[in-house]
Amino acid sequence: MIPWYPAMRKRYRIATTVLFIALCSVSVAQSKAEEQLQKERSNLTRTSDPVSRTKIEIKISDLLITLMSEAARAGEDKRAEQYLNDYSNTISDAHLTMMKTGKDAHKHPDGFKDLEISLRKQQSRLTDAGKLMDVDSRDAVEKVRKQASSISDQLVKTMLLKDPNATKD
C-alpha cells in the first residue's frame, strides 16, 4: 500500500477542488444561457411586429447554438440534437415571418438583412459544434447548416432583386 504523504493529500484536494469548480462553472454558464433563452421566448410571445419577432428569433437561434455546443462538449448528444431541432424550427419560423410581411425587401431590408447576416455567421458556428458531436449527429448538423445556407441565399435574392422570382441576366 502506498502511504499518503501530506504533499500528495494536498495535491489531491487541490485537483478535486479545481475539478469541482470547473464543473460548477460549466453548469452555471449553461443555466444562464437557458435562463436567457426562456426570457427571449417569453418576449417572442408578447411581440407581434414581424421585424421585432425576427430579431428576437435571431437571439434565440444564437442561444440555441451556444447551448448545443455546450451540450455536445459535455457529451450530451441527445440534448444537443434537441437544441439543433429547436434551432432549425426557429430559423424557419423567422424566415417565414419575414416572407409573410409582404414588404419589399429591396426597399425595406430591416429584418431580412438582420436574419441573413446572422445565418451567415451561424453557419460556421454550426460546423464547429458539429465537430464536437458523434459521427451520426454530424449529418443532422450538416443538414441544418445547409438549411441555414439555403434560407440565407433566399434572403439575399429577395433583397437584391426587385422581383424575387425574376432571374438576373
Predicted regions and their residues:
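Hydrophobic h-region of N-terminal signal peptides that target proteins for export
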Residues: 20-28
